Amino acid sequence: MDTHLKRGILDVCVLRAIQNEDSYGYKIIKDMKPYLEMSESTLYTILKRLELSKMLIVYSIEHNGRLRKYYRITKLGLNRIEEFKKEEAMTKCKKAS
C-alpha cells in the first residue's frame, strides 16, 4: 500500500476515534483495538502530525497526581473526515461503473 495513502487512512482512523469525545493516548489505542492494531509509537507520531496540521488540539489534565494529555478534534479535523468520506464514495462509484 502506498505510504501516503496508508498515512491518510491512519490519520482519519485516529480522528474518528476522538470525533465524539476528547481522549488520551492509551484510551485511543484501547478503543481502536477491535478494528486496528496500532503501536503506541505509531499513535503518538500520528497525534503529533495531526496537532502540527491543526486537526487536533492538545491539553493536559491532572489525573492521579500526573498530567495526562488529552486530544480534541478541531474543525479542520472534522473537515478531513468528511473529505475522506467523499473520497471513499467516489472510489466506490468508480469501481461500480
Predicted regions and their residues:
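Short alpha-helical
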Residues: 50-51, 79
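Accessory beta->alpha helical hairpin/"wing" motif in late/C-terminal subdomains of nucleic-acid enzymes
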Residues: 73-78
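Short, hydrophobic-biased segments on the C-terminal half of alpha helices
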Residues: 44-49
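Beta-hairpin "wing" of winged helix-turn-helix
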Residues: 53-67, 72
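Amphipathic alpha-helical dimerization/coiled-coil segments
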Residues: 79-97
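N-terminal helix-turn-helix DNA-binding core of bacterial DNA-binding proteins
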Residues: 2-42
